[in-house]
From Swiss-Prot:
Lineage: Bacteria, Bacillati, Actinomycetota, Actinomycetes, Micrococcales
GO terms under cellular component: cytoplasm
Protein name in UniProt: Malto-oligosyltrehalose trehalohydrolase
NCBIfam families referenced in this protein's UniProt entry, alphabetically: trehalose_TreZ (TIGR02402)
BP terms from Gene Ontology: trehalose biosynthetic process
């Protein structure tokens, strides 16, 4: 904790510290790199104090590196010393998260209370399920009380309604005590539209550089060295000071960086260095829609050296074949051939024509890159929440089809990820919700959602108002569901699938991948198992081999062998 209160404001003529209960105003001194600070540490006693800055008479604004915002992003921040927490995870050695089972959750809707402390009380459910890691949607501070978290404006501060930074430390500690790793979702491609005062301090945003969500960060323009340092230091903060085990990097395709050394490569090198310093593995997972192996190619082979990246193509192939939905970006994925290709080659679009994009897309995955470096899922926050009404797959198909999707993801060759509630077939939607204090911003957000859905062929009239508190309320999990059927049976199947997955060598490829389009049957072998998935009603033959290990759906023995009544899944052990 630095009580000289340094802040970067390279273009300011004057910066004044506003500090303490009496809001004393103390002038700061500038160094040659544009950093302002007190010449001597402030001696205001041991208590943590509120502080902010006047920049050329404007403000006061919160510190861009503020670690706590107890009264919101427009107010003064409060000192926070992460070293004061008495960690109990000295025995935690971390784990390689490629090949692990990841569970994605949103703090605000995971429990009725919507806090990190209340989430701790549900961690034992995840342990019984058998997952290896919890991935938290962004927890950085944003304007308003509730939202998805992707409009953060103070990236170092934990959103106060979730419990603030101390609650975050308690959550990570509780996860590690149960053998669960923690992946933190971070957003470095834009800043939120409300409460963003970073441009008042300096050129954090790129000139004329914008993406889907707003102004892009200044990664390659004048004075961009400190902007990049701001991002890399933030990653280090979550991993070192808050003990996270990995980061999910949001929409890296939206990063605008023309430097020879790309930010992602620089970040990966620093995180590798940090892993050596900490003596535990750290994982960087990119979200990217580029289907570009450069992200996860080694730096020695002129890649960025990230550990894994999301694979939307697996989702699209699973979703289209399980639900039969082929509108919008699902159009190319409607046949079982799409499933065959992603199981054999990792991506469907690897230089092929994309009808949704109306151009060729992607490039082939390097043959030496194992599929565990691709994160696959049947549902996630984007693919559920960005539907017109935020309906889960459970609103479109029955439990047998949900079980089929689960078998594809959890026993496939990828790193599997589940979305909270998926494991019991939650019937609660997960919708897009916001709490922008500015009415005009809320209205603009709603209009943007309606325009976005038009291209997918969904009825804009049914899109819920993101600003309506009922939209947020509907999106909370119902924890009574897994205690009753049919949810309890599906939960047991997920649990058994995850246990079965542990028998498989992590890099075992999918072999003998077969598909029968007419009958809606997809099958593959991995390790000692043969997986048969029936996507349509009716009996499907299942090879007996060494005997049935697990099934969802009735399996009958007859003269011709085993038959599974679809939809469902059956797994047998190979002789």
């Amino acid at each position: 904790m630095n009580r000289r209160f340094p802040v970067w404001a390279p273009q300011a003529a004057q910066v004044t510290l506003v500090v303490g209960q009496g809001r004393a105003e103390l002038p700061l001194t500038r160094d040659e790199n544009g950093w302002w600070a007190l010449q001597q540490p402030w001696d205001g006693g041991p208590d943590l104090v509120d502080y902010g800055y006047l920049v050329d008479g404007k403000g006061p604004f919160a510190d861009p590196r503020s670690l706590r915002q107890p009264r919101g992003v427009h107010e003064l921040g409060r000192e926070f010393d992460p070293a004061r927490y008495a960690w109990g995870d000295d025995g935690w050695r971390g784990r390689d998260l490629t090949g692990a089972v990841i569970y994605e959750l949103h703090v605000g809707t995971f429990t009725p209370e919507g806090t990190l402390d209340s989430a701790i009380r549900r961690l034992d459910h995840l342990v019984r399920l058998g997952v290896d890691a919890v991935e938290l949607l962004p927890v950085n501070a944003f304007n308003g009380t509730h939202g998805w978290g992707y409009d953060g404006v103070l990236w170092y501060a934990v959103h106060e309604p979730y419990g603030g930074p101390e609650a975050y430390q308690r959550f990570v500690d509780a996860c590690h005590a149960r053998g669960l790793a923690v992946v933190q979702d971070v957003v470095y491609n834009h800043l939120g539209p409300s409460g963003n005062h970073l441009p008042d301090f300096g050129p954090y945003l790129g000139s004329g550089a914008a993406n889907t969500w707003g102004d892009a960060l200044n990664l390659d323009g004048p004075l961009s060295d400190e902007v990049r340092r701001y991002i890399i230091d933030n990653a280090v903060y979550w991993l070192r000071d808050m003990h996270a085990d990995g980061l999910r990097l949001d929409a890296v395709h939206a990063l605008r960086d023309a430097r020879a050394l790309h930010l992602l490569e620089e970040l990966a090198a620093r995180v590798d260095e940090l892993a050596g310093e900490l003596g535990r593995p750290l994982t960087l997972i990119a979200e990217s829609d580029l289907n570009d192996p450069k992200l996860i190619r080694s730096r020695a082979a002129h890649g960025y050296g990230l550990d894994a990246q999301w694979d939307d193509d697996v989702h699209h192939a699973v979703h289209a074949n399980v639900t039969g939905e082929t509108v919008g970006y699902y159009a190319d994925f409607g046949g079982l051939g799409a499933l065959v290709k992603v199981f054999q080659r990792g991506w469907f679009h690897d230089g092929t024509w994309s009808s949704f994009r109306e151009r060729h897309h992607g490039r082939p995955l390097d043959p030496d890159i194992p599929f565990r470096r691709l994160v696959a899922f049947a549902q996630d926050h984007d693919q559920v929440g960005n539907r017109a009404v935020g309906d889960r797959m459970s609103a479109q198909v029955g439990e047998g089809s949900l079980a089929a999707a689960a078998a594809l993801v959890l026993l496939g060759p990828f790193t599997p990820m589940l979305f909270m509630g998926e494991e019991w077939g939650a019937r609660t939607p997960w919708q897009f919700f916001t709490s922008h204090p500015e009415p005009e911003l809320g209205e603009a957000t709603a209009r943007g959602r309606i325009a976005e859905f038009a291209r997918m062929g969904w009825d804009p009239a049914v899109v819920p108002d993101p600003q309506d508190p009922a939209t947020f309320a509907r999106s909370h999990l119902d924890w009574s569901e897994p205690e009753r059927e049919p949810h309890a049976g599906l939960l047991a199947f997920y649990t058994d699938l995850i246990a079965l997955r542990r028998e498989l060598p992590v890099d075992a490829p999918a072999r003998e991948v077969d598909a029968d389009e007419a009958r809606g049957v997809f099958a593959f072998s991995r390790g000692p198992l043969r997986v048969t998935v029936a996507l349509r009603p009716g009996p499907v033959g299942v090879p007996e081999h060494g005997g049935l290990v697990l099934a969802y759906g009735e399996v009958r023995a007859g003269a011709a062998g085993l038959h599974l009544d679809g939809p469902g899944a059956a797994i047998v052990r190979l002789e």
